[in-house]
Amino acid sequence: MASVLGSGRGSGGLSSQLKCKSKRRRRRRSKRKDKVSILSTFLAPFKYLSPGTTNTEDEDNLSTSSAEVKENRNVSNLGTRPLPPGDWARGSTPSVKRKRPLEEGNGGHFCKLQLIWKKLSWSVTPKNALVQLHELKPGLQYRMVSQTGPVHAPVFAVAVEVNGLTFEGTGPTKKKAKMRAAEMALKSFVQFPNAFQAHLAMGSSTSPCTDFTSDQADFPDTLFKEFEPSSKNEDFPGCHPVDTEFLSSAYRRGRLLYHTLDLMGQALPDRSRLAPGALGERNPVVVLNELRSGLRYVCLSETAEKPRVKSFVMAVCVDGRTFEGSGRSKKLAKGQAAQAALQALFDIRLPGHIPSRSKSNLLPQDFADSVSQLVTQKFRELTVGLTSVYARHKTLAGIVMTKGLDTKQAQVIVLSSGTKCISGEHISDQGLVVNDCHAEIVARRAFLHFLYSQLELHLSKHQEDPERSIFIRLKEGGYRLRENILFHLYVSTSPCGDARVNSPYEITTDLNSSKHIVRKFRGHLRTKIESGEGTVPVRGPSAVQTWDGILLGEQLITMSCTDKIASWNVLGLQGALLCHFIEPVYLHSIIVGSLHHTGHLARVMSHRMEGIGQLPASYRQNRPLLSGVSHAEARQPGKSPHFSANWVVGSADLEIINATTGKRSCGGSSRLCKHVFSAWWARLHGRLSTRIPSHGDTPSMYCEAKQGAHTYQSVKQQLFKAFQKAGLGTWVRKPPEQDQFLLSL
């Protein structure tokens, strides 16, 4: 029994000794860990990677509550340095010192080879976009823009203005739309997960109004300002001494972010790679970044034109000038914006990114500027250096004809000015007046005059005249344009209607100085005000006006220029009468002098008719190339003149129309009125009746001649139904009595 007890005590003593030894081992290990805990906690986010091979004598694998640190240290190069009182870790004492690794052959400098900040688990909980935006920009006003869609599935649009730009979000509820608008605003200038981290990164935890629109942070005491190139590091040009005050202050904040700093100096772009022969199929964004690094692209709008089809507008500011692009994706929109900047500033055209109907809807900037200059110079010439009384105008429009995109052979064929419509009391049932005297509409009527004259030229008995005509005869009958004949419309300001009212901003030299006009009923059809300026959305389902109602004082309604130009992109410029003779004629490009927004202009001119469906042969949904001008025409202050001027190539002088009466100042009918065109058409019809497909009996009335263009009329009805189906309103027509007059030779 005693032996058993003795052996039990012996084994118990051995076990006790082993336990004590194990406890002492754990205690020593714990003390050793405590000694390096300060250094571990401080250096946990930073990982030092030597550029060369070093002899590693010791390696500790430590773990904290949120991050694992693996550290390769050269013990022979470790020095000690007291840790500032503010940098003590939890549970540590002031006597603890931290170790500072040095790189051999670098003069004892602390090398920043790759600095990584890791977001710890105890960082601030991410906040939603509304809260973040409020912290960065307090006092913002969100406004309800529109509500579309059916009652059971509404779509709300909410807008917010930040730094002079307006961001619009859409959603099934106002709250989601508001959140989406805030997200888009944040994406334009915040580069961090939440607002608090953004402030810490920029060196300020108290000022919520820091401007993040600049990529190059030049604010005092900010993150990137502390890292300056050092000329002392001759052996290691890529290494820079770290400012210990910056590191300690970053540690004291207790918020560690993830960021990797580029250690190499910014390389200058290789100009040889930018030679025209070396560009090849390179992306314009990449090429522009090599010329001007650090550019930021801002998403100005994101709209859903139809289910699962979105349209984006991106803008970039280069050398004080703003360029924008639109596309089905942000990548395509950025590419267009970069391409526009390359063309305007560096005269670089990338072969793989030349604007075309299939790839881009942007016109080369230099070509657009040339068209603008041709129109303004011609107008100056016709008004004797703008000294004529008829030189005064609010809107100037013109159409330029080119062969391809060769500006050397460009020719101004029509010019016009004006901003008013006739008064209802002056409407004519004989086609003796011009109802709409807005510059764009008068330019199109002058273009009809040009087409009639070209048809007559083709029928001339002189042998050389048919070759000078822009038309060639088709085997199956009728005529079409010669190959490579293009027409370009220039308007000094954005067309009245949705293109002007709902344009997000006017491009200026600074994105932050852009102005925004409230966008309500965006995309809706709009009508002009009788004898005045401006437009209003269409009201009610009624699509026909009555003759007697207008004579008794009812307002005469005329569709806006934006909507009429949009219809030309489906029906063509030639109208119903000329469809008896020629194929539809479309604009190749539209150049706007001021108050324009390329993305919105494309949306209202082409994208609103996405649901029009299949069109008959020779008709198409035209998508003209769009562009602004480098130097917009100055705004014309004061009241608009009550006259409209027009000119057609071959004419000696301007014709002046009284915009209130729709007739010339002398009281006679204009060369652009319906009566003149009807007589011209009747003469041509008599000569061409054997050369064109027959459509029945020869019409005797103007309205019968128009209705006789059956294909044109069916496409017209198809267009109006597409507007209604899209919820954009009903096209308002003039009283039918104004077309019920006899054709005369």
UniProtKB/Swiss-Prot annotation:
Pfam families: A_deamin (PF02137), dsrm (PF00035). Residues 20-34 have a biased composition (Basic residues). Gene3D superfamilies: 3.30.160.20. Residues 1-35, 50-104 are annotated as: Disordered. Zn(2+) binds at residues 438, 496, 561. One of its GO terms (molecular function) is RNA binding. The keyword Nucleus applies. Keywords: Hydrolase, Metal-binding, mRNA processing, Nucleus, Repeat, RNA-binding, Zinc. The lineage of its organism: Eukaryota, Metazoa, Chordata, Craniata, Vertebrata. This is Double-stranded RNA-specific editase B2. GO terms for cellular component: nucleus. Its main location: nucleus. The gene is Adarb2. The active site is at residue 440. Brain specific.
